Every structure is written in C-alpha cells, then in structure tokens.
Amino acid sequence: LGPNFNPLHTQGAVGDNARAISSYNSLLTSGLWQQDYEGKTSPNPDFCTEFTSAMENGKQVLHITLNEKAKFNDGTPLDIEALRATHKVLSDNKTYQIQSTGLYPNIESIEEDGSATRVKVTMSKPSYPIASLFSYVVHPKMTDTDFFANGLVDKPNSDYAAGPFKVAEGGWNSTEKTLTVTRNDKWWGEKPVLESITFRLLDTPAQRSAFANGELDAVNANVVSVYKELENVKNAEFRQGQRLFAGGVVMNPVKVDTPLRRAIMVGLDRKALSDTRFKGLPFNEALPGSRIHMPFSEYYADSMPQAADRKAAAAKILEEAGYAKSGDFYEKDGKRAKVVVNNFSEDNT
C-alpha cells in the first residue's frame, strides 16, 4: 500500500495498491470500461456512453462518446484532453516509467468529433482488443513528468481522481500504513453502500491475527496453513469464488530459448503441481487451458499442449533442436539446459 499512489508508474504498479486506489479513482484503474460477472467488457456509462470500432477508408477508427457529467474532482472535465494525456503517457515508457505501452503507439490521431466529449481515434494499424485502450484514463496533470513520478508519493491526492469515494482528510497515515476513503459528494454515479473504507497494510501473519481479533473484516485463506489456522475463528465464514486470473510461469526468452520453453510446457505435469499447491484445501476446479479466456467464457477453448507421453514429447522437442542427453540432463553447445524459478512468499507452505 503506497507509498506511490500512481498505479501506472512502475513503483506503484502493485495489485493491492491498485485495488485501494480503485476505490477513489476508478477512472485511473479501469478507465472507460466495465466487466460483468461473465467477463464481458462494455463501456462504463459513468464515464463513457459509446465506444465503437470500424474500418473507415482502410483504417481502424474508434468513435468514443464521453459522459458529459463526468469530471475529475478538481472540476477538470473528462474530455478529449484527458484521452490525449492518456495517450501521451501510455505510449512513452521511457519518459514516464510505465510497465508497457500496449496498443497506444498504434494511435495515429485523436480528434474532436463534433465536441470535446465526442472523440474520434484513428489507428495506424488494426489493433485488438479495443478494450485495452483507455482502460486507464489519466488527469491531464499526469503529463507532467515530475508529477507523474513523484506527485503522488505519500500523497494520495484525489483532486486529480474520479470515483465514488475520495481520500478522507488526513486519510493516509504513512506511519501506520492505513488509507481511509469516504463517500465522494462530487460523484455523479450510483451512491456507494459504504460510508467509508479503511485499507491497512499488514504482513501475512499479522493479517490473520487481526482477523481473529476482529480488527479486519476479511482475509485471504488460500494456503492450507492459513486455512487451518482460521477454521476455528468464531463466526468466520469461508467463501470461495472464481479467481479472474490464470497465472503461469513466465520464462525470459533471452535466457531460455524457444525449444526449451516448449519442452517445459509440454512436459510439465500441471495436475501434480496443482494437487501439491492446493492439498488440504476445499479446491477441486479443473486446470485452466487458456491464458486468454476464463473457463466460463463463451470463447474459452483448452489450448494447452496434450501429449500421451509428456516426457517423450519434451525429449523429442529438445533433440530436434540440437540438445543431447548427458547423464540425467540435456545439454547444448556444452551448456546444461536449466531454468531458474523464484517464488516469493511469507508462508512456508
């Protein structure tokens, strides 16, 4: 949680940090888009009433209509200037130290289409999915490189934000690592149910103690040691839902060549890994077969490589690429094939 409350900067791009920021600046964390429970994406009417894509004169053109009620908390309108600022920041990962430019370098022009809230975006080449464009929208102030890097460090300023909550007066306590947000009286959308939310940074063991003592309302219990520890906490309810994420091992293509990466993917016993990871937990979902679509999506298809003999299939890939077995390991050009995987956790299970 913090200290950099800019989730687009590499130093603020942490999942828990972004979740806290989303309470008071949903425009920055989810942009013009929303998703339903099936994972289908559509324009968020609080910010955008139309977002279409079509080919015009051989070029992909996006037509965007912004909600005229939408404003940042300092009164700055959500209009073409905010989209231009977003394009400027997210197409330049050297100046602004963002994680990835995505499709933003493919934007050729951003023009008014009759008014400042009706915007025409022309792409230099067809780009998909369009929902990855303006899935973050920044206040024009964020184009200031110093402010982008340092302006929100230990200063979660909601003046440049737009969302159902705002940072409370003195809401960030950098010593105790707590952030409190309250209802935003400038919010034009649906009124939030809660009057305030307090986010608190705790290490994993401290979270469990705080939950057991009634200081926290919820805590993750996704490893067996935590689950067992919390089973007997009075009035605790265990709730299980679909995680909207399919993770995997990311291998550096500079250090691990394509044949070795392919061999690992074909030869890996994913079920054995899953059984080990979730042993002792009431979890029995099927292994995900796609890194693009969730199993409940209508577009889902299991695209993972299938082999009757994984070991033989992996060996064949390596040997066709010039690897040769030496003892228990494969080598190529005198170097042993290896991949180093680091896993960080505060829990020894």
PLM region spans:
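N-terminal lobe/hinge region of extracytoplasmic solute-binding protein
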Residues: 1-55, 160
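Ligand-binding "clamshell"
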Residues: 227-240
